[in-house]
Amino acid sequence: GEIDWAKMKQQGMDFAYIKATEGSAHEDKRFDKNWKEAKAAGMLCGAYHFFSFESEGAKQAEHFIKKVGDLKGSLIPVVDVEYYGKYAEIPPDVEKVRKELREMVGALEKKYGRNGFSDWAHSSAQ
């Protein structure tokens, strides 16, 4: 739905993470609008990616980077990893997920720098 970013800022919200991408092909159709409006309202913004168990980590990183581009002056990128669909009942292989997540984090780190992102992600993936 629509978000009134100015109202969110008035209510004391100082930052927002906005969904940009999912998997290796999906883009959130509201990302550009939400990003622009949240920044115009004076909020510090960060972009996040919804991790897919069906796509290679490197391809997901490439997709995210292509969509969001330069993130200077923004919050560090976030990768949202959670069980969805059939994986809620039958979780994916942990080692495969770790491998793909490490590849994604490595590519994001190469593009955006460490800034604590890698330390958190690597410890969480172990």
Regions found by a protein language model. Name each.
Residues E109-Q126:
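Aromatic-lined carbohydrate-recognition surfaces of secreted/lumenal glycan-active proteins
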